[in-house]
Amino acid sequence: MLGSPPDMGKPYRPKDHYFQKAKQEGLRARSAFKVDELIKRFPMVKKGHVVLDLGAAPGGFLQILADAVGPKGRVIGVDIVAIRPFSQPFVQTAVLDVLADDFDAKLTELHAGPFDAVISDMAPKTSGIKATDEARSLRLAGKALELAAARGRPGSSFVAKVFMGRDFEDFRNQIRALFEEVKVVRPEATRGASMEVYLVGLRRRAPEAPEAN
């Protein structure tokens, strides 16, 4: 996961209920429970699907997504920090920066085809300045949406973590333009002090065919 937990004026307690539960169940991060809730609530990820996980370190989302797609599917996880390798051959990880100029080309080297879901848990390193953190969060989410628009197959799904702020509605409308249905979800595993929510886009609209001259 990119960045660090936002400071909302309350002590940061990493060893909470979900932290302990993740440890007991062999999950790499408490965030695994967030994506588990999302894919159970919405029909986004199925056996055989190809899924892109952005901001994937340390791998909690990847563990849940790997179980969801199974060995006939594929999960690609990227982050700016290394992710401990997975034993399943259908889970691939890479150290990449989504904001780098060569990101799209490097992602295509990993997988040239379309994705059934683009899921982003990316978050910026927070500054403590609310407006700045919101803008940085939307920049990352916006890049994820660009990828979903360019690489998501018709009917595919999209998930992005964002910090709610002034431009939240504008970004939600951008998702609505691409997907038939958009949901705003705050998973139960989200820390009480966090300002994050997840925007979920369901059923990617088929791109319109260019008009004939």
UniProtKB/Swiss-Prot annotation:
Subcellular location: Cytoplasm
Residues annotated as the enzyme's active site: 161 (proton acceptor)
Single GO molecular function: rRNA (uridine-2'-O-)-methyltransferase activity
Binding-site residues, S-adenosyl-L-methionine: 59, 61, 79, 97, 121
Entries under InterPro entries matching the protein: RNA_methyltr_RlmE, RNA_MeTrfase_FtsJ_dom, rRNA-MeTfrase_E, SAM-dependent_MTases_sf
Cleavable signal peptide: none
Name of a matching Pfam family: FtsJ
Spans through the membrane: none
CDD domains: AdoMet_MTases
Function: Specifically methylates the uridine in position 2552 of 23S rRNA at the 2'-O position of the ribose in the fully assembled 50S ribosomal subunit.
Similarity field: Belongs to the class I-like SAM-binding methyltransferase superfamily. RNA methyltransferase RlmE family.
Full protein name: Ribosomal RNA large subunit methyltransferase E
Phylogenetic placement of the source organism: Bacteria, Pseudomonadati, Myxococcota, Myxococcia, Myxococcales
